[in-house]
Design a protein with these regions (language model features):
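Active-site-adjacent loop/helix segments that line or gate small-molecule/cofactor pockets in enzymes
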Residues: 18-55, 103
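Short, well-ordered beta-strand elements within core beta-sheets of diverse protein domains
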Residues: 58, 78-79, 194-195
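PLP-dependent aspartate aminotransferase-fold enzymes
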Residues: 114-215
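Active-site and channel-lining beta-strand-loop segments
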Residues: 49-71
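Short beta-strand-to-turn element immediately C-terminal to the catalytic PLP-Schiff-base lysine
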Residues: 60, 79-80, 175-176
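Glycine-rich loop-to-alpha-helix module at the N-terminal edge of alpha/beta enzyme cores
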Residues: 66-152
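Conserved active-site and cofactor/substrate-binding residues in soluble primary-metabolism enzymes
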Residues: 27, 31, 54, 81, ...
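N-terminal mitochondrial targeting presequence
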Residues: 1-24
Length: 215
């Protein structure tokens, strides 16, 4: 059986010149993996698959191998890849107005907020960039409600969290993680969290009985 290995030409740009590098499909993934290993801070350990393009529910790696995308961004983004309508909308907006600071209003944010609040049955919303940012803001909201409405003791607000949670990698979020790999060597951790087993209502009720500062 004869093995055909695809040759791929890559342009590498540095400060002084373009370098022309010839790679085969056999070592192309290794090339990109080694680049990340050499120049990236290793805060994550992804699968050794180097993706290059996507369409609909499918993705292809740099060697042309096809995959079903069952992860999407851990379900945070699930619109599929390169939907022509979305591509057109993104392109049109980028050609019209690319970015505005919250120091200004724009003609899209209010319409988005109206659509989202009516869709989910909320009164108001505060958009966030990431899940961890949303959790951080929820913590602030809960604490402020506790001080202004519930009248908990000053700077003593507590939040009950479940063991084995994962909500991100910011300093406060890892402070209520029970995973040593997420929080070791990052202390001192943010105080004010009470851990209980997931799914045990009696444990939650018991904490509310013991501590009047739970928000």
């Amino acid at each position: 059986m004869r093995l055909n290995i695809l040759k791929i030409t890559i342009f590498i740009f540095n400060q002084n010149s373009f370098k022309l590098i010839e790679k085969t499909s056999k070592d192309l993934s290794r090339y990109y993996l080694d680049l990340e290993k050499k120049y990236g801070a290793h805060d994550y350990h992804p699968l050794p698959v180097v993706l290059e393009k996507g369409e609909g529910v499918f993705m292809w790696d740099v060697n042309g191998k096809k995959y079903y995308d069952f992860l999407s961004a851990y379900s945070a983004v699930n619109q599929g890849h390169c939907h022509p309508e979305l591509v057109s909308l993104i392109k049109n907006q980028a050609e019209t107005l690319t970015l505005t600071s919250r120091a200004f209003h724009n003609n899209k944010l209010g319409e988005y907020m109206e659509f989202a609040t009516k869709l989910f049955g909320f009164d108001q919303l505060l958009p966030m960039n990431t899940g961890a940012e949303g959790v951080e803001t929820s913590i602030k909201l809960s604490r402020k409600w506790g001080y202004l409405k519930k009248k908990v003791d000053e700077n003593q607000a507590k939040i009950v969290v479940c063991n084995n949670n994962f909500h991100g990698r910011t300093t406060t979020v890892i402070s209520f993680s029970s995973d040593p790999g997420s929080k070791d060597f990052f202390g001192p951790h943010t105080p004010g969290f009470i851990h209980i087993p997931h799914g045990e209502i009696s444990a939650l009720e018991n904490e509310f009985k013991k501590d009047k500062n739970i928000v």
